[in-house]
């Protein structure tokens, strides 16, 4: 195994820390982005809790290997930009896709991703980007739970109302018989 220079060891340590702390990572190939585009992308990603880094493929490979992340090597070619999502798993993929949907020609090609320590291919990253955010998913689950409960409550309410109407009718009938 090759020895790594101290400055490279520091870069590997930073990559390892980011890989460990991130909920997901998107690896992308940025083809000819301007400085203004990169700055704007970084700003938008930062607002979503995503950090954008450019790193050497060999250092990414070393950091991944040391963390036990396997299967990343085939995707480590060209210029690799990493988007580390620290809050929402889908935020990085979603924001990158949204940002480049505005461009006429895509200059950012998603290569792969890392989700829960497992490597996913570009199609997996795109599927991750298509997922609704956490709040929307929770709302959908709660709506799914709430709907049957509302149906049961409505049925019980209907039975009670029918019983009340029948009881009221019987009271009127008895009052009419006494008079």
Curated annotation (Swiss-Prot):
Enumerate the GO terms in the molecular function aspect: large ribosomal subunit rRNA binding; structural constituent of ribosome
CDD domains xrefs: Ribosomal_L10
> Superkingdom of the source?
Bacteria
Keywords, ordered alphabetically:
Ribonucleoprotein, Ribosomal protein, RNA-binding, rRNA-binding
Cellular component GO terms held in the UniProt record: large ribosomal subunit
- Which Gene3D superfamilies does the entry mention? 3.30.70.1730, 6.10.250.290
The UniProt entry's GO biological process terms, in alphabetical order, are:
translation
What is the annotated role of this protein in its UniProt record? Answer: Forms part of the ribosomal stalk, playing a central role in the interaction of the ribosome with GTP-bound translation factors.
What does the record note on quaternary structure? Part of the ribosomal stalk of the 50S ribosomal subunit. The N-terminus interacts with L11 and the large rRNA to form the base of the stalk. The C-terminus forms an elongated spine to which L12 dimers bind in a sequential fashion forming a multimeric L10(L12)X complex.
Q: Which family does it belong to?
A: Belongs to the universal ribosomal protein uL10 family.
Protein name (database record): Large ribosomal subunit protein uL10
């Amino acid at each position: 195994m090759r020895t790594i220079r101290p400055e490279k060891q520091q870069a590997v340590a930073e990559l390892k820390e980011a890989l460990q702390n991130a909920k997901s990572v998107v690896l992308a190939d940025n083809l000819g982005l301007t400085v203004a585009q990169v700055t704007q992308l970084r700003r938008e990603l930062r607002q979503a809790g995503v950090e954008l880094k450019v790193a050497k493929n060999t250092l990414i490979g070393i950091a991944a290997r040391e963390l036990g992340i396997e299967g990343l090597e085939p995707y480590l070619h060209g210029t690799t930009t990493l988007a580390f999502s620290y809050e929402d798993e889908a935020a990085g993929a979603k924001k990158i896709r949204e940002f480049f949907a505005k461009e006429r020609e895509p200059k950012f090609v998603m290569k792969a991703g890392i989700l829960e320590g497992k490597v996913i291919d570009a199609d997996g990253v795109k599927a991750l980007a298509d997922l609704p955010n956490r709040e929307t998913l929770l709302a959908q689950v709660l709506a799914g739970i709430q709907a049957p409960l509302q149906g049961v409550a409505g049925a019980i309410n209907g039975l009670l109302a029918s019983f009340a109407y029948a009881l009221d009718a019987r009271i009127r009938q008895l009052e009419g018989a006494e008079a």
